[in-house]
């Protein structure tokens, strides 16, 4: 156990060191990609949190959009500072998610999946209809965040390099919070609801309450991801949060695996690296993504996170066969 913890600490320290020096090695293009990568990490890991109870939600991306719109409006119309808009936008997304859950919580499995798409799409279409959200054009000229403590300092994140480090810090904090939750007793209850709902109910577990909790916590972090994305892009519109984006999120999760905390991180990292190479396929990229998904479902149903165990099993089987 001690050796595992030591290796984990060393690995994390090496990774953080790499991420700190990365923007000084690569061009601005790759720094921008890294910021998108950080946002996608928060989005994917928060989505996986919801799946621990057995619920797969296509409303996750629209709720991310709710956080993005809230952060943009608070910045442009109210002039609120970033450190206030960031958590508030997450809370607004959470409250909207709670309203959406009222009809959804009565559904399970496939019905929940389809119902979440319908309600998420209704939310997205409301941004087109309501003028405060800018209609089809969305909201432009979203100011870069600044962090100011009167009498001490003012940090401006209008340049890509400072914003990279801001996004990195927020991502690390969000992932750490979700990791601690994943290691807690609460997530064990989430998994029990997924694996043995009747048994969990028989021992007094409030299944509805814990499903709501998982959904709301995941939605909060999705809202945070939306704020980071809005400030990075400087523009948001309803088309950024369409079904296609939600399907890509599902592919990241399924290919990476969602049984453990590490799975979605592996999935997002895989597509962040190979996604750039796949750009040569142009309009055929969705087909390539589909082929990767089918291959993963056929040969790695538990995702890329299960690859080391699977290879170890095959090597042992081959070794045993050779000895016999």
Residue ranges and their predicted role:
Residues 36, 40-41, 64-69, 90-94, ...:
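Residue-level recognition of pore/gate-forming positions within transmembrane alpha-helices
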Residues 23-77, 103-112, 257-261:
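Single transmembrane alpha-helix segments in multi-pass membrane proteins
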Residues 211-295, 299:
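Transmembrane alpha-helical segments in multi-pass inner-membrane proteins
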Residues 156-237:
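Helix-loop-helix "hairpin" substructures at the membrane interface of multi-pass membrane proteins
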Residues 78-121, 266-268:
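Alpha-helical transmembrane segments within multi-pass membrane transporters and channels
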Residues 1-41, 81-85, 322-324:
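Membrane-interfacial amphipathic/re-entrant helices at transmembrane-helix boundaries
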Residues 119-156, 302-307:
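Extracellular/periplasmic helix-loop junction at the C-terminal end of a transmembrane helix
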Residues 1-18, 138-140, 195-209, 278-324:
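Cytosolic-side transmembrane-helix boundaries in multi-pass membrane proteins
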């Amino acid at each position: 156990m001690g050796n595992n913890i030591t290796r984990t600490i060393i690995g994390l320290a090496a990774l953080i060191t790499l991420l700190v020096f990365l923007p000084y090695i690569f061009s601005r293009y790759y720094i921008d990609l890294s910021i998108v990568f950080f946002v996608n990490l928060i989005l994917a890991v928060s989505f996986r949190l919801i799946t621990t109870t057995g619920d797969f939600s296509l409303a996750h991306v629209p709720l991310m959009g709710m956080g993005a719109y809230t952060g943009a409006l608070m910045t442009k119309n109210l002039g609120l500072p970033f450190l206030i808009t960031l958590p508030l936008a997450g809370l607004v997304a959470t409250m909207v998610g709670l309203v959406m859950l009222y009809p959804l919580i009565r559904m399970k499995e496939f019905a929940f999946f389809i119902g979440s798409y319908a309600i998420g799409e209704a939310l997205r279409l409301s941004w087109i209809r309501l003028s405060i959200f800018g209609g089809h054009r969305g909201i432009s000229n979203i100011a870069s965040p600044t962090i100011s403590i009167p009498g001490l300092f003012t940090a401006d994140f209008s340049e890509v390099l400072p914003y990279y480090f801001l996004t990195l810090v927020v991502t690390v904090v969000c992932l750490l919070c979700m990791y601690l939750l994943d290691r807690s007793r609460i997530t064990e209850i989430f998994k029990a609801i997924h694996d043995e709902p009747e048994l969990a109910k028989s021992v007094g577990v409030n299944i509805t309450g814990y499903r709501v909790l998982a959904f709301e916590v995941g939605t909060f972090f999705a809202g945070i991801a939306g704020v980071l994305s809005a400030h990075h892009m400087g523009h948001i519109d309803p088309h950024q949060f369409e079904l296609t984006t939600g399907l890509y999120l599902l592919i990241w999760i399924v290919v990476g695996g969602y049984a453990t905390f590490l799975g979605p991180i592996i999935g997002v990292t895989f597509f962040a690296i190979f996604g750039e190479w796949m750009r040569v396929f142009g309009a055929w990229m969705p087909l390539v993504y589909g082929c990767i998904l089918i291959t993963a479902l056929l040969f790695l149903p538990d995702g890329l996170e299960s690859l080391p165990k699977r290879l170890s099993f095959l090597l042992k089987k081959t070794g045993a066969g050779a000895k016999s």
